[in-house]
């Protein structure tokens, strides 16, 4: 009887000691060519557009746990007070997975008031890769 209790305890310990390992998906979709979406007079994040208050989006928990990666290309305007407005997700891969955290983050961004009154059609690429969030060009 003790042998079976010991054997059962051993199987329980082995089962508990082997949680499913996190394995990120290595297939990251190629970044879009941001300038290809823009007109010659549009601003591009990291070039003519630089925030004075900036927070990166939070990597969604379910995307992180499932190893999902991707990017979001955002078009936005900056008003005369340096606040973001008219935020549009132009494209995202995988579609819709990262859109909500991107919108939440961009709504918090602040810029120095533009000298021309406002900046229109600014584009920003946000990458979600291997649990990290970064800006692209």
Can you name each region flagged by the protein language model?
Residues 1-9:
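Sec-dependent signal peptide recognition
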Residues 16-33:
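Bacterial Sec signal peptide processing site at the extreme N-terminus
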Residues 32-75, 100-137:
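Short proline/glycine- and basic residue-enriched helix-capping loop/turn segments at helix->loop/beta transitions
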Residues 61, 91-97:
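A short acidic/small-residue loop/turn micro-motif
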């Amino acid at each position: 009887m003790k042998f079976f209790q010991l054997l059962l305890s051993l199987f329980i310990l082995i089962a508990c000691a082997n949680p499913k390992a996190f394995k990120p998906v290595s297939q990251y979709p190629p970044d879009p060519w941001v300038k290809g979406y823009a007109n010659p007079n549009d601003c591009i994040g990291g070039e003519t557009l630089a925030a004075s208050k900036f927070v990166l989006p939070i990597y969604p928990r379910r995307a992180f746990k499932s190893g999902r990666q991707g990017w979001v290309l955002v078009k936005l305007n900056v008003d005369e007070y340096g606040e973001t407005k008219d935020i549009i997700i132009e494209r995202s891969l995988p579609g819709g997975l990262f859109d909500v955290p991107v919108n939440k983050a961009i709504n918090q961004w602040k810029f120095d008031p533009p000298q021309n009154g406002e900046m229109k059609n600014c584009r920003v690429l946000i990458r979600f890769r291997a649990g990290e969030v970064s800006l692209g060009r």
